[in-house]
UniProtKB/Swiss-Prot annotation:
Gene name per UniProt: HOXA2
Covalent S-S links between cysteines: none
Main location: nucleus
Protein known as: Homeobox protein Hox-A2
One of the record's GO molecular function terms: RNA polymerase II cis-regulatory region sequence-specific DNA binding
Main function: Sequence-specific transcription factor which is part of a developmental regulatory system that provides cells with specific positional identities on the anterior-posterior axis.
Amino acid sequence: MNYEFEREIGFINSQPSLAECLTSFPPVADTFQSSSIKTSTLSHSTLIPPPFEQTIPSLNPGSHPRHGAGGRPKPSPAGSRGSPVPAGALQPPEYPWMKEKKAAKKTVLPPASAASATGPACLSHKESLEIADGSGGGSRRLRTAYTNTQLLELEKEFHFNKYLCRPRRVEIAALLDLTERQVKVWFQNRRMKHKRQTQCKENQNSEGKFKSLEDSEKVDEDEEEKSLFEQALSVSGALLEREGYTFQQNALSQQQASNGYNGDSQSFPVSPLTSNEKNLKHFQHQSPTVPNCLSTMGQNCGSGLNNDSPEALEVPSLQDFNVFSTDSCLQLSDAVSPSLPGSLDSPVDISADSFDFFTDTLTTIDLQHLNY
């Protein structure tokens, strides 16, 4: 008893090896092998072996020695395994998570044989397409093929109206032999296409504008540089022209002065003497009256104009200035030298103090010229 108890404890606690199982238990009958071969030939499904208790007699409660003779008698293996197993018993139970979601792929097939029930459903491509077409919501909707006339009419309508109201949509669908949904979907897709095209154009235009702005800025900078350079050149040219013009004027004036000095120097010594002599004669002999003074002033002015030549008017020399100053001073002395009663008769009002100062200065100037 102790040996058997230890053997049972060791068998339960530790898994026995394959050799130990084969030596300790009697061999399996050939009927099981033959029945299993027959069932495997009948069906292509996975083989379901009998329970583990039936294969091992030691685990079978009827064959254990402790149960004695009161246990169930061992059934005959030939009678139990000779008859084929029904198809319903071999089919596994169907659980909710094993059910397919789409009703389109469910095929109701009659359970004629175990192979047709358990094996994979082999359908042709045409049958699968028919099943997919038959199911409305499960399959993907086919793409609509529009004709050229339909596309032309839709494009014309989109050109005038980007959005359609429902009456117009129904009208177009009736005219083009389309459904209202097809017209609506086409307009939605066409609006998205139009949006993409406009965005691309805007991006290209913005890039072009940016490039044009950069080019215009560069052109403006170049023009500014050119304008500054041209202004500098023009200023320098103007300065050079001015310098050349002034140099030419100076040269011409020097030439004219030299020519006038050489040509007119012979006549000048005579003319001042004649004018001075005339002035002195008038100053000595004539009485200091206003009419005489005016006559002498007219004569002196005429003599002065006669003495001045056109060459002397254009380029006056130092001698001309001296002659003019002496003549004018003499003429003024002749005009101012009369007494106070004669000068008071003149229309110009002059005070006595200013008149005395003016006569004193003129007499001093006349004396200086007379000394020469």
